[in-house]
Curated annotation (Swiss-Prot):
Belongs to the mimivirus L5 family. It comes from Acanthamoeba polyphaga mimivirus (APMV). Residues 540-556 have a biased composition (Basic residues). Residues 523-556 are annotated as: Disordered. Residues 523-539 have a biased composition (Low complexity). This is Uncharacterized protein R821. Residues 427-503 form a coiled coil. Keywords: Coiled coil.
Length: 556
């Protein structure tokens, strides 16, 4: 978007924060969205708020939903603090905001800077100019981007996953983290200014470094319909990164930042295991190595007391991982390999020597790519031929410190050609050991078949387990349905029981009344019968006295 849209909300004019970040203004850092802009600049209410669409109107929102709740910033605040020229907010403007001429920013190590501009990344520099760091050395191209797994990504105090630009390799001395992304993600205000301040505890080279980032401009003006396809414009800009040591320095020296306390504890826990842990704890932390590594070469060649003369080809690592260590220019492809070719009368000893020399270079991952047996008296001739092959194909890498370095192309067909040349030279100079070479090839083929079978078995096991998991999931769903049905039936029975209980209580009340009435009636009858009996007894006594008196009168 190349212009800002003004909306009226609660008697104030606002810009959408996302529109401001889409402008990609040169004096502002690169933000992924408007929320990052508001958080990084510390914009407070009422200078900003959240709104969401309700029909054709915008209503106030709480900002919880990143999808529907849009951050907006007051026009007055944006013009005073965020925008350089007010012309960019006019809707009639149709020109893209591209700054053709940018000034080169020179940062001195000993300069103390307290202005807000210290948190801004240096502007884009057209072409690959000679840039130098505080140590006086030329700033090289940035190593390749390292993609982290989801479980490896950083989280803030709210357990939110952060998108941090990471470059280099998985080595503590060759991995780099974007200062701008760390500042925004962990809410570390003015991190760049802190690093560059006069009294800073950050040391260039140890805690932070500069790299040149390649920028490819693929923007095409759609209004100009031209059949000619122009090449994208490539430019470079200087960017600051923290090293792994600098990252932990930030964790331990920054106050008030939104760091994940659990992550800090996890770091110290594992560091303790490595330093003072038991052997069992250390073994659990050890990672499994893949490919023919230095340790595997040790395991193979220490089983025999015989020396193994050979011409060899080691891969030290990819160009993108070693670009900073070898100070390589942009003419080398990121995915090509840097190799070491040569001869030796003892492949095991030479592996240990190269591990000591090249294995400790930042970004290196030393592997024995290929080796073939050559009779000792033919080693010099074989080495000369193999180096001539690399020289004729223009694959020799000149380095002021290391010799016999070569470039191994990333294409499989080119790698196969190199290996075929090694095999041809071996067949030419192997002599009586030709049969041994063939036997080694057979063993290598056997190893490949075993590895393939092992891989297939693993795939089958994973497929089986995945099917079992799906089966268990279906069974669990059926069980949940049965449980829900059972709970429903229980609820129905509970209702029936309550109804019967009420009915029983009602019936018991009626029977109690009936029983009381019966008792009253029986008591009434008993009292009536007693009265009747008393009356009859009285009448009888009267009759008896009357008869006695009549008899006495008669006797008289």
């Amino acid at each position: 978007m190349n212009m800002l849209t003004t909306i009226k909300f609660q008697n104030d004019n606002y810009y959408f924060a996302n529109d401001i970040t889409d402008l990609k203004l040169t004096h502002l850092p690169r933000y992924n969205n408007g929320r990052e802009l508001i958080r990084d600049k510390g914009i407070k209410e009422p200078d900003f708020t959240y709104v969401k669409k309700s029909g054709n109107k915008w209503i106030e929102a709480d900002g919880v939903s990143c999808r529907y709740d849009k951050p907006i910033i007051k026009v007055d605040y944006a013009k005073e603090n965020l925008l350089i020229e007010n012309k960019i907010v006019k809707k009639v403007s149709k020109k893209p905001l591209i700054k053709t001429k940018s000034k080169k920013v020179v940062v001195k190590e000993d300069s103390e800077s307290n202005s807000e501009s210290d948190d801004v990344e240096p502007e884009i520099v057209d072409g690959m100019k000679q840039e130098y760091g505080p140590d006086g050395k030329r700033i090289g191209l940035a190593p390749g981007i390292l993609v982290l797994k989801k479980k490896e990504m950083f989280k803030n105090a709210d357990k939110e996953v952060l998108e941090i630009e990471v470059r280099g390799t998985r080595r503590y001395d060759n991995i780099f983290f974007s200062v701008n992304d760390l500042s925004v993600g962990f809410h570390v205000d003015r991190l760049r200014a802190t690093v560059l301040s006069k009294n800073s505890s950050y040391v260039y080279g140890l805690h932070f470094r500069y790299f040149m980032i390649e920028i490819i401009d693929k923007n095409v003006d759609e209004r100009k319909k031209s059949k000619k396809v122009k090449e994208p414009k490539i430019s470079y800009r200087k960017k600051m990164f923290l090293t792994y040591i600098g990252l932990h320095h930030m964790f331990h020296t920054t106050k008030g930042a939104a760091f994940d306390i659990d992550f800090i504890g996890w770091i110290h826990k594992n560091l303790f295991k490595v330093h003072l842990g038991t052997d069992e704890q250390k073994l659990k932390l050890a990672s499994n190595l893949m490919g023919l590594s230095v340790n595997e070469v040790k395991a193979v060649f220490t089983k025999t007391s015989s020396a193994f003369p050979a011409i060899y080809l080691y891969t030290i690592g990819k160009v993108k991982d070693l670009r900073a260590s070898f100070n390589l220019g942009p003419e080398y492809d990121d995915d090509d390999f840097i190799g070491k070719a040569g001869k030796t009368d003892n492949i095991y000893r030479r592996t240990m020597e190269h591990d000591e020399t090249y294995g400790k270079i930042p970004g290196a991952n030393l592997h024995l790519k290929w080796y073939v047996f050559v009779m000792p008296f033919n080693l010099q001739k074989a080495e000369t031929e193999i180096l001539n092959m690399f020289r004729m194909t223009n694959k020799i890498l000149t380095h002021p410190k290391h010799n016999e370095l070569v470039i191994i192309p990333k294409e499989k067909k080119d790698q196969k050609y190199i290996i075929d040349q090694y095999d041809c030279i071996s067949a030419k100079y192997a002599g009586i050991a030709k049969g041994l070479t063939e036997e080694i090839e057979k063993l290598n083929d056997k190893i490949e078949r075993i590895e393939m079978k092992h891989s297939n078995d693993i795939d089958k096991i994973e497929m089986k387990h995945s099917n079992e998991i799906e089966k268990f999931d279906k069974e669990n769903k059926l069980l949940k349905k049965d449980i829900n049905l059972f709970e429903y039936k229980l609820e129905q029975k509970d209702r029936e029981i309550r109804r019967l209980k009420k009915l029983a209580d009602y019936n018991s009340d009626e029977s109690e009344v009936e029983e009381k009435s019966k008792k009253l009636l029986s008591g009434f009858k008993t009292s009536g019968s007693s009265i009747q009996s008393k009356k009859s007894a009285g009448s009888k006594s009267k009759k008896s006295t009357g008869s006695k008196s009549s008899k006495s009168k008669r006797s008289k």
